[in-house]
Amino acid sequence: MGKIIGIDLGTTNSCVAVLEGNEPVVIANSEGKRTTPSIVAFVEGGERKVGDPAKRQAITNPEKTIFSIKRFMGETYDQVQKEINRVPYKVVRGDNNTPRVDIEGRLYTPQEISAMILQKMKKTAEDYLGQEVTEAVITVPAYFSDAQRQATKEAGEIAGLTVRRIVNEPTAASLAYGLDKTNKDMKIAVFDLGGGTFDISILELGDGVFEVKSTNGDTHLGGDDFDHVIIDWLAEEFEREEGVDLRKDPMALQRLKEAAEKAKIELSSTTSTEINLPYIMPVNGIPKHLVKTLTRAKFEQLADGLIQACIEPCRQSLKDAGLSTSDIDEVILVGGSTRIPAVQAIVEKFFGKAPSKGVNPDEVVAVGAAIQGGVLTGEVKDVLLLDVTPLSLGIETMGGVMTKLIESNTTIPTKKSETFTTAVDNQPSVEIHILQGERSLAKDNKSIGRFHLDGIPAAQRGVPQIEVTFDIDANGILNVSAKDKGTGKVQSIRIEASSGLSDDEVKRMKEEAAANAEADKKEKERIDKLNQADSMIFQTEKQLKDLGDKLPADKKAPIEGALNKLKEAHKAQDIAGIDAAMAELNSVFQAASQEMYNAQGGGAQGGPQADPNFGGQQAGGNAGSSNNSKDGNVTDVDFEEVK
């Protein structure tokens, strides 16, 4: 059985891990980093960049650099107006009222953008393992709705992954924290404040069982919001002084975002930071600079509403679990935003104990996902994960009331049936309107799907018996069926339409993603070949110079002829021509070397072999070093950085 990788698909950063010899390993990406920015950029010529390369060019390409896409996953266009106004890229209304990212007229769904990030994580794992990866456990915020979970699963499918399990992020973190503590009975609170979402989960650990007792949270509260209070403060200060709103200019907004994120991070370890943005915007033809000092106290004042918003979900989660703060043995901090000192302080004040800092908040979720992958393959034994559904599920009944079938914090998988009847005489069909939420009225909850049960025999109201069944799988994804007990007729729906994508659309996007991956592979091979040719040209010229007059003119001429052919093919980026010229150059150089060897009785120069590993180096890595060098010698080369 192949490896099942664990992926933390984050709002700000993503991380991938795998189980190796019963130990979870966080895998570094091609840039050598253990986390990858969840950023996708579209650049000239149709090329895509993902991760750090995308982040580096964001300021000069703000309208085609996509970040925080997780906040759009599984939501309708109307639900993400706040997010749309915060990002410099263009988001438009698509089919089924879904948000789509507009890149020069091509509309991308949030699932497609997320799939590009997942492809990067998949490739990272494949490079490390040396084998193809087809299965993954992907994490989501515990408070993600059914539509958001389904959208995440679709993103995995588009990326070419079979998503074996969707796991809640706090639950994954508890697995990573508690795997070596399975012989202890303890109650833990996992406080997970990431880049875009906040979750609090209360769990009981004992005898290898990880049981979630309750969960609560806010899917629109996270590091992005802390960035934006700084962005708004900077923009308002500049507008007060200069009369111009920087947030209306995409490039200025992107610079503000980068500066705000940097300032927020610095204020976790220092009490004051200077924000210095030269030439931020011309005003009346005069270039203006933005220079401000932000203290930790001022930042905490700006972000106080966000920090306080974390407490009510904690209080509700404890209440739902039937526990008090004194019952909690350990508080685990997860997510980069928990590094903010004011967040740590309020957690300690609420729970009455200092939170544990024994886990890496950026990596622990991916580690837990990898452990769950090991549970599924059988590598990890004697571990049972019992998760819950975060929100109540039900249907709309007469009078616009929501009738709950499954209450929030019910352990999953679970199945529940209830019998309903018709509201009017001779009603031939019923509409099953499926809802998710905690409010009493249907209109105040989230609509996640509708379907009809037709062919009900004519009868007085109250006579037909319609059995509605809700079935939630281990991924937290819902299936609903309705059965007319009189006729035995059944109609069912898997709640997929709420994500806005049909099966055909997912299939098409998957094929496009695979085609793009193949195109990316070919492009890399092309660049590798150009780099090999460049290396061979350099080595040949160097050896010709070293040989000098030792090489007879009649031997030197064919080498120079072949070298010129290689230079011309390299300049034209003619791959077939490069292959032919490299072969010819090797041949003539070897022939000349052999003749010199025979004439001198040994000690001839070898041919200018291109280093096969040279072209494969990532820009910014150890380019120019050959892994094939057995004597430790390294040839220094000039190269053009290619991304």
From Swiss-Prot:
InterPro entries from the UniProt entry: ATPase_NBD, Chaperone_DnaK, Heat_shock_70_CS, HSP70_C_sf, HSP70_peptide-bd_sf, Hsp_70_fam
Stretches that traverse the bilayer: none
Recorded GO MF terms: ATP binding; ATP-dependent protein folding chaperone; unfolded protein binding
Keyword field: ATP-binding, Chaperone, Nucleotide-binding, Phosphoprotein, Stress response
Induction note: By stress conditions e.g. heat shock.
Location of region: Disordered: 599-643
Alphabetized CDD domains for the sequence: ASKHA_NBD_HSP70_DnaK-like (cd10234)
UniProt cross-references to NCBIfam families, sorted A to Z: PRK00290.1, PRK05183.1, prok_dnaK
Family as reported in the entry's similarity comment: Belongs to the heat shock protein 70 family.
Role description: Acts as a chaperone.
Annotated protein name in UniProt: Chaperone protein DnaK
Source organism: Parabacteroides distasonis (strain ATCC 8503 / DSM 20701 / CIP 104284 / JCM 5825 / NCTC 11152)
